[in-house]
Amino acid sequence: MQASSISVKITDRIFGILNRIPYVAFYARTRGWEFMLSWGHRITGLLLILYLWFHLITLSALSIPGEYDAKMALFSSPLIVFLEWLLAIPVIFHAVNGGRLMLFEFFGYRDDTAMIRWLFAVSAAYVCLLAVFMFLGNQSVSPIFFWLTVFLIAVICGYAFLARIWRLGHSPFWKFQRISGVFLLVMIPAHFLFMHLNPAVGKESAVIIARMQNFFVKMVDLAMVLAVVYHSGYGLFSVGKDYIVSRRLQILMTVLVAAVMVLSAWIGLKIVIRV
């Protein structure tokens, strides 16, 4: 997987910008980009967990459509729309960097320089594509066609990855965290893209409710909620275990993370089922 001249130009520009940030430049020079990307993966993961809660709180207002529409009216200002676009950066970075780690861990690909270049190039292409759709604001696609296509791709990728890691000596919890990551690598960027094809798709209660009441879309949403909650919870557990030495504190952390994730799953499943 050689980096093309286009990806090299894109990533050189991105590296040039990042190297102007003193903190980033210092650690990239002294610890390497692999260290920076590792911490970036953890930080973006935490940001996305916070966004998950915000998303659940927002969607809970769908039980009263008028209240939901009133809230969404507050999110129509140019500043909020710009912040929504910025949120795509941690979304796609976490997804694509997760793919890089999987290639490294399980498929033996060791050209990390090329993978890092592709990470930044793909991320840049995604946020630019999203910016185009958000600027146009008039795109549409059949929800059934879109999610059937995306869901099949995600399931096929997840199954192929499961076949790769099934015989490894790790626990089922560890394996499912990786499989859920492959599934979400496809689903979450697609979800983010779909929700910004036009303002009505993500901000008009009638449009959202009509889509979520479709049986197949409801099943897709349920699968996505469970995968996101599990992947997030196991990620928090893994990060905490790296820094918490005490066995008692590890148990306490595990209980707290499990409780928060069960609560998140309950809220998410209730929203999807009741709509």
Please report, for each region that a protein language model flagged, where it lies by residue.
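Membrane-embedded alpha-helical bundles that constitute the cytochrome b-like, heme-associated redox core
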Residues: M1-V275
